[in-house]
C-alpha cells in the first residue's frame, strides 16, 4: 500500500470511524457543540464504500458482549477486531493528527490499521453527501434509523460550512 497523506480534516474522517468503533456510541452536543456525556445514541453499524461495489459494514457488539466488532464485505463476514484495539488506535491517531505538521502529512503505521479495517481511503468518496453513515439506536423511540453525517473537524483550522472548490458556483 502506498504512503497515505492527508490534511487534518481528512485524517479526522478516519479518526471518527475508529472512535465510533472503539466506543460504540455517538454523543449528543449542545448548541455550542459541547459534548453531552449522558445523552448518546448507541451505534449498531457503520457503513463505508471506499471502492465502488465493495460495501464494508462494521457491526458493533451489544455492550454486554465480548467487545468484538464484526466486519462484513458485501454481506459476507470477513473478520473480527476488538474494540480495545480500536481504542488504542483511536488515541494514537488523535495525537498524530494534533501533532501533524504541514498542509498534508502521513501517519506512521496507519496503513496496517486501515488494512485491518478494510479501509482504502481516509475520507469518504466525493460523490457521497455524507462523510460517514451509521445505524443508530434511539433508546427513547426504539427505532434504529440509518443516518448520514458530515464531519467537521476542530483539530486543525476552524471548520467551514462550505468547502470552496472548482465546482463551487454562486
Q: Where are the regions that the model predicts?
A:
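Glycine- and acidic
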Residues: 1-3
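An N-terminal, globular interaction/scaffold subdomain
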Residues: 5-8, 14-112
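Conserved catalytic cores of phosphodiester-cleaving nucleases, focusing on short active-site segments
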Residues: 20, 132-134, 147-153
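Short loop/turn segments at secondary-structure transitions that flank enzyme active sites
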Residues: 26, 138-140, 153-158
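Short acidic loop-to-beta-strand element that houses the catalytic metal-binding Asp/Glu
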Residues: 45, 127-137, 146
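Extended alpha-helical scaffold and adjacent linker segments that couple domains
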Residues: 77-81, 85, 116, 122, ...
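Short N-terminal edge-element motif at the start of the domain
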Residues: 103-129
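Mg2+/Mn2+-dependent nuclease catalytic core
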Residues: 145, 151-170
Amino acid at each position: 500500500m502506498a504512503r497515505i497523506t492527508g490534511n487534518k480534516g481528512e485524517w479526522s474522517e478516519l479518526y471518527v470511524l475508529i472512535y465510533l468503533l472503539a466506543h460504540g456510541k455517538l454523543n449528543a452536543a449542545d448548541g455550542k457543540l459541547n459534548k453531552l456525556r449522558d445523552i448518546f445514541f448507541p451505534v449498531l453499524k457503520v457503513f463505508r464504500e471506499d471502492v465502488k461495489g465493495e460495501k464494508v459494514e462494521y457491526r458493533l457488539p451489544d455492550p454486554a458482549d465480548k467487545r468484538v466488532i464484526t466486519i462484513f464485505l458485501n454481506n459476507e463476514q470477513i473478520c473480527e477486531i476488538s474494540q480495545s484495539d480500536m481504542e488504542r488506535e483511536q488515541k494514537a491517531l488523535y495525537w498524530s493528527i494534533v501533532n501533524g505538521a504541514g498542509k498534508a502529512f502521513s501517519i506512521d503505521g496507519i496503513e496496517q490499521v486501515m488494512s485491518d479495517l478494510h479501509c482504502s481511503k481516509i475520507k469518504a468518496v466525493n460523490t457521497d453527501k455524507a462523510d460517514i453513515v451509521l445505524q443508530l439506536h434511539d433508546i427513547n423511540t426504539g427505532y434504529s434509523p440509518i443516518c448520514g453525517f458530515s464531519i467537521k473537524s476542530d483539530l486543525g483550522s476552524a471548520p467551514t460550512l462550505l468547502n470552496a472548490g472548482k465546482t463551487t458556483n454562486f
